[in-house]
């Protein structure tokens, strides 16, 4: 099982004082050194944390794949084609939200998403759709020719309900049946990571805010190593 580390909130801290530190590339590189299999960043339209220069610098210096989260807009598409990350993850975006509140509606936004997915894939960039854990959303992700789906697991991480966990497990199994790799992300901490890691067809977890918070107490290396240890042990014992 793989671990993706999202470093958006390293940039949030930097931007609060308009300083050059903390350095997003240095923190990302430390995360990789300590077990991160790929690095994720969300380049939002309002540039509230990650900025264009961060994305280009990460692509240049990282020894692991870069996963670029972005809205399905013309501006972001052109940036992605210039950066050429290994993967782009298409997400919904609202200016007033604190963080991404839900998955992208692959059915309702089909006509908007289709040309963006096609253009990215023709440019040699793999495409992931960040979706709710629902079979219909998986179906439309497949119709859009997405390479992967990432399940929005925020509802489970907040509620810890068995019903939400079953939704994730069912959507992951269905994604596998449809031939699409399945990741999970949003709101994950050590406890929820341990549980989600037992779901056979979830192949990677994306974790950001929690790991950055843990890093303030224990350091980046310790936080990332602990998370990687937990998910690998849970997967092995599942």
UniProtKB/Swiss-Prot annotation:
Pathway it works in: Cofactor biosynthesis; pyridoxine 5'-phosphate biosynthesis; pyridoxine 5'-phosphate from D-erythrose 4-phosphate: step 5/5
Sequence positions that bind 1-deoxy-D-xylulose 5-phosphate: 8-9, 44, 49, 99
Record: residues binding 3-amino-2-oxopropyl phosphate: 6, 17, 187, 208-209
InterPro entries, per database record: Aldolase_TIM, PyrdxlP_synth_PdxJ, Pyridoxine-5'_phos_synth
GO BP annotation list: pyridoxine biosynthetic process
Keyword Transferase on entry: yes
Keyword terms: Cytoplasm, Pyridoxine biosynthesis, Transferase
Reaction(s) catalysed by this chain's protein: 3-amino-2-oxopropyl phosphate + 1-deoxy-D-xylulose 5-phosphate = pyridoxine 5'-phosphate + phosphate + 2 H2O + H(+)
Residue numbers marked as site, Transition state stabilizer: 150
E.C. number(s) listed in UniProt: 2.6.99.2
Entry-linked SUPFAM superfamilies: Pyridoxine 5'-phosphate synthase
Active site: 42 (proton acceptor), 69 (proton acceptor), 186 (proton donor)
GO cellular component: cytosol
Highest taxon listed in the record's lineage: Bacteria
One example GO MF annotation: pyridoxine 5'-phosphate synthase activity
Cell location: Cytoplasm
Main function: Catalyzes the complicated ring closure reaction between the two acyclic compounds 1-deoxy-D-xylulose-5-phosphate (DXP) and 3-amino-2-oxopropyl phosphate (1-amino-acetone-3-phosphate or AAP) to form pyridoxine 5'-phosphate (PNP) and inorganic phosphate.
Family: Belongs to the PNP synthase family.
Subunit structure: Homooctamer; tetramer of dimers.
Protein name: Pyridoxine 5'-phosphate synthase
Species classification: Bacteria, Pseudomonadati, Pseudomonadota, Alphaproteobacteria, Rickettsiales
């Amino acid at each position: 099982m793989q671990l993706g580390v999202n470093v958006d909130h390293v940039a949030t801290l930097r931007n609060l004082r308009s300083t050059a530190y903390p350095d997003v590339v240095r923190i990302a590189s430390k995360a990789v050194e300590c077990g991160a299999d790929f690095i994720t960043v969300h380049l939002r339209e309002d540039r509230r944390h990650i900025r264009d220069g961060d994305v280009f610098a990460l692509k240049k210096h990282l020894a692991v794949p870069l996963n670029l989260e972005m809205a399905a807009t013309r501006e972001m598409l052109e940036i992605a084609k210039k950066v050429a990350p290994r993967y782009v993850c298409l997400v919904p975006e609202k200016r007033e939200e604190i963080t991404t509140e839900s998955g992208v509606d692959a059915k309702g936004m089909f006509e908007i998403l289709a040309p963006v997915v096609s253009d990215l894939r023709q440019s040699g960039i793999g495409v992931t759709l960040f979706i709710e854990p629902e079979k219909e959303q998986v179906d439309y992700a497949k119709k859009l020719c997405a390479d992967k789906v990432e399940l929005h697991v925020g509802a489970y991480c907040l509620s810890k309900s068995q019903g939400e966990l079953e939704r994730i497990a069912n959507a992951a199994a269905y994604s596998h049946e449809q031939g699409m790799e399945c990741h999970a992300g949003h709101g994950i901490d050590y406890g929820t990571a341990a549980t989600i890691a037992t779901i056979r067809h979830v192949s990677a977890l994306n974790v950001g805010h929690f790991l950055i918070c843990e890093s303030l107490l224990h350091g980046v290396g310790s936080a990332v190593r602990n998370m990687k240890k937990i998910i690998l042990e849970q997967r092995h014992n599942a």
